[in-house]
Design a protein with these regions (language model features):
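Conserved histidines in hydrophobic membrane contexts and catalytic metal-binding motifs
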Residues: 27
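A short, structured beta-strand/loop element
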Residues: 38-40, 44
Length: 98
């Protein structure tokens, strides 16, 4: 999936993401850089709506929602789950979807 298609497909799921407690979603990695192969997964990190109870089970639910909707593997994490040594670089290259 190329960058523009991935952005459009993720943006089209904004309502479903918001309904699941997501305040913001960002595409990063090879797809965001325009370097994805046909079989590449989508790397996404999210910010959770403030004052929302959100667990690991909720995060897994969002991952499954996106994978079912997009028909592609999604590597999903929260902003806080980004590796501290890579976080600045990931945030610089990330494309905000929601």
């Amino acid at each position: 999936m190329n960058r523009d298609v991935a952005i459009a497909e993720l943006a089209a799921r904004a309502e479903g993401l918001r309904a699941r407690g997501i305040a913001a979603a960002y595409l990063f990695g090879s797809t965001a850089r325009g370097e994805a192969r046909a079989d590449s997964d989508l790397d996404v990190f999210v910010d959770i709506e403030p004052n929302t109870r959100f667990s690991l089970f909720d995060l897994i639910g969002v991952k499954h929602f996106l994978e079912d909707e997009l028909g592609r593997e999604v590597d999903l994490t929260t902003r806080g789950g980004l590796h501290p040594l890579l976080r600045d670089e990931i945030e610089r290259e990330a494309v905000r979807i929601l």
